[in-house]
Design a protein with these regions (language model features):
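A generic local structural motif
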Residues: 20-22, 47-48, 66, 130-131
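A generic structural signal for alpha-helix starts
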Residues: 67-68, 103
Length: 170
């Protein structure tokens, strides 16, 4: 992993990736909604709230096939997920892929159930009696974003700030 301190002009130390990872893996309920940024076919940006879950070094989210975000990802899989976690804001760039293997779908269905939404896995996607209105009608596809680059900014009160970019090995 390549790391660059974006706050060295202020004499601040770089943020270790372990700090971001600790926030991602804490299991604390999020008070802020993660947002997914995609690109429309004409190049205009699109941003939508998603229920993102960090699992095994990757971010997962769901979306209905007919939604703008899913249609955008079908044309251009590059995307960004931004989130505010305890003590750190993160922006994670990566490439989204639709997940179809049953083992991963079952594992992530359990992770979502642990957070209060218990989808069933049916025909390579999630189903349930409800989801976020922006997800479109069921079934909902599961997507995985493998991080390529991430940016972190410390937000904890009472400590010096910091900003760091991390580039991950492909």
């Amino acid at each position: 992993m390549d790391q660059k301190n974006l706050a060295d002009l202020y004499g601040l130390d770089p943020i270790p990736w372990s700090r971001a990872l600790e926030a991602l893996e804490s299991g604390e309920p999020r008070t802020q909604t993660p947002f997914l940024a995609t690109t429309r076919p004409d190049g205009r940006p699109h941003v939508a709230a998603v229920g993102a879950i960090w699992d095994d070094g990757k971010l997962y989210f769901t979306s209905g096939a007919g939604t703008r975000k899913s249609r955008n990802l079908a044309q251009n899989a590059n995307c960004v997920i931004s989130m505010s976690l305890t003590g750190i804001d993160l922006v994670v760039e990566g490439i989204a892929e639709r997940v179809t293997d049953d083992r991963t779908l079952q594992r992530l269905a359990k992770r979502y159930a642990d957070q209060g939404w218990a989808p069933a896995v049916t025909d390579g996607a999630f189903t349930h009696e409800y989801s976020a209105p922006s997800a479109g009608p069921p079934p909902w596809d599961l997507y995985v974003v493998t991080p390529t680059t991430a940016f972190g900014v410390l937000t904890a009160q009472g400590e010096p700030g910091g900003a760091t970019r991390w580039r991950f090995d492909a």
